[in-house]
Structures are given as C-alpha cells and as structure tokens.
Amino acid sequence: MTIPILTYHALNISGNDYATNDHVAFASDLELVTRAGWQIQPLHRIVDCLFDAGGTLPEKTIAFTFDDATDFDFADLPHPTAGPQRSMLNILRDFAAAHPGAQPGLHATSFVIASPEARAAMDRACIIDRGWMNDHWWPEAVASGLMGIANHSWDHNHECMARVAQRNQEKGNFFCIDTEADADAQIREAAR
C-alpha cells in the first residue's frame, strides 16, 4: 500500500497564495483531498497499522505533517510581511467545523526539534530572534485531538549549532546522519 504523506513548513510564508504560503496550501489541500475521496488518518495510526498485521486502513489513506514545529503550527500570528496567519491547528479546526464528519480521522503530526538550545539557536539565526520556536504549546496541541507531536530530531543537525549530536560534527543536512549510532544519538538526546 502506498500512502501519501503531505508535509508543510508553517514558516514557509513569503506571500499569501498557494505557492508562497504553506498555510494557504494546507487549507486548500484539506479541501482537495476530501473532494478526491482520500481519508485523512493520524500518522501514528498509519505506522501502527503497517507494523501490525491486524490493522487496516482505508484504501485511499493520506496523512499530513508539519516540519520544524514553529509557533505558527499552533497559534495565529502576525507575519511581518504577509500579515496575520491562521495557525495550522486552527486551519484543522476550521475544516472540522465547516465539514462535520467528513474526515473522522482528521489529524496532523508536528515534527518538533527536541533541544531547547537548538530551537533558540535556530530562532536567532533563521527567524531573526522572533521567539517563534517554543514548546509551551505542545501539550495543548496534543490535547486538541487534531495534532500529534513527534520527534523531528534533537538538534536538526543545523549549521547554526556550536555542537550537534552527529559523530563528526558534520552539520547542515541530515545525509550525514547515516549510521544507527548517529540516529540513536539524536533519539537518546531527545529522550533526556
């Protein structure tokens, strides 16, 4: 079974149309996949079913994820050039209110960067120190029933970090996380 997983970056905002704003794209894609007969399922359910011989999924199953877990995943925020942005969670809520029962499995998974130090460094280096990479919202997002939180990585292996979990201190992409030991280091650090 092939299952599409559509991924968005809530900080991907350079305008207010489909091609330049992942919030606009996500809201549009929710409508599109529903009209096309796809059934949205929580990513954790898909994984459970794929690894459990007794689990079943609808034939046209799809999942949604958000990468890097900025505060735009959870809260409506003003973008400095594109104006007010509806959060990914509130887009899910809006869809559920507009289409009651249309997607019983409505859910998205936000992949978070576990290290508070990495989030702070990335916020300073990549988001001009706007304070948009917090973890205070994670429990409330999960409690909504519409969003899950999963581990993206410990430190994003980001070049702005003084030290990363990667064994040779190679930074800038995930291609150098190429051994079980490096992957385990990311998981071990996140579990602390």
Residue ranges of model-derived segments:
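Non-cysteine beta-strand/loop elements that form the S-adenosyl-L-methionine
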Residues: 147-152
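Alpha-helical scaffold elements lining the catalytic groove of polysaccharide deacetylases
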Residues: 77, 82, 139-143, 155-192
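Amphipathic, alpha-helical segments enriched in basic
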Residues: 8, 13-15, 165, 169
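Short hydrophobic/aromatic-rich motifs at helix boundaries and adjacent loops
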Residues: 1-3, 163
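Active-site beta->alpha N-cap acidic-glycine motif
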Residues: 3, 10-146, 157-158
